[in-house]
Amino acid sequence: LVDSSTNIFWTRALLGVGEAPLFLAGTRVLVHWFSAEERGSAIGLFNGSASLGPALAPPFLLAIMAWWGWRDMSVLVGVINLLLAVIWIVYYRDPVSGEVSAPTPAHSARASLRSALKDDLGYLLRQRNTWAATAGYTGVVYLSSLYVTWLPAWLEKTENLSVIQAGLLSAFPQIFSFLGCFMGGRLMDMISQRGVAPLVACRRTVVLSMLACAILTGTLALQPGSIPAIVLLTFTLFASGVAVSCGWTLGTLIVTENRVATLEAIQNTGASLGGVLAPLLTGILATRYGSFGPAFILACGIGLVSVVMYHKGFSGRTLKS
């Protein structure tokens, strides 16, 4: 329905507003259903869906766009999402169902909101672990957003591919990002089931995966040939997926259940910052130097800072008091 770039911008902004609570609400649901020792796989699969979409979408959406145009493609995507929303509303239930409670009076709701801001948000913002988790996850999302937003353009420029060819080829490594998300959660659960504390298992996994992702990203700055580049991208996005899964799960392990959504909201603010800076800085550097090499080097450095934050930034205790 839009007819200008300005309207597209505002429509995309509204889409972002609608998407913002999804990860927070979904994480809260998984915390309800799964214990700390088994929630890694569930959250990994949940986070992995965000990578599976970009992997599956290009071949289908490009075909639809080629046949019917981008407007019909957008309508189809919207209809599918509305159907999924209806299915969720109809079938989802909390693990423990009871009688419907009476509506909360307005003054009680306002008091609860003030209490939550003071007791939860204020408390969490004063804690070192909150800032370490947020800073670390900013780097995680910076690297993942770099590949989501610029991978097709990078392949198009360096390998002299058409837009459609680059879009299709970029979908292949994204599948490994999904596998990394799921395997990262599964790996955490396996380590926890061997007697290692879930928080320790999560931190170890995110540190190692981010270290691998940062080093592999720096290697891409050397501009290897097409086949080595695709192989490197496959391993890089797998490691990135592991880090995304573990970094998000970490927030559910350092706070009590009633504070999970608040902490994840704080962490998600850092993630949004990383998601904005990655395409912006990459575009600036690629334009300035005529190459993606400097952008990959910067991303490598940001990834290494994230590793330090996860390894050294935590105080060693949870925020469950």
Cite the ranges covered by each PLM segment.
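Helix-breaking motifs and short loop linkers at transmembrane-helix boundaries and internal kinks
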Residues: 1-7, 35, 160, 223-224
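A late C-terminal transmembrane helix in Major Facilitator Superfamily
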Residues: 252-289
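Extracytoplasmic gate region of multi-pass secondary transporters
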Residues: 127-182, 244, 248
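C-terminal transmembrane helical hairpin of 12-TM major facilitator-type secondary transporters
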Residues: 199-247
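Helix-loop-helix hairpin linking two adjacent transmembrane segments in secondary transporters
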Residues: 46-96
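Cytoplasmic helix-loop-helix junction between adjacent transmembrane helices
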Residues: 11-50
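Juxtamembrane intracellular "pre-TM" segments in multi-pass secondary transporters
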Residues: 99-134
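Paired small-residue
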Residues: 6-14, 228-235
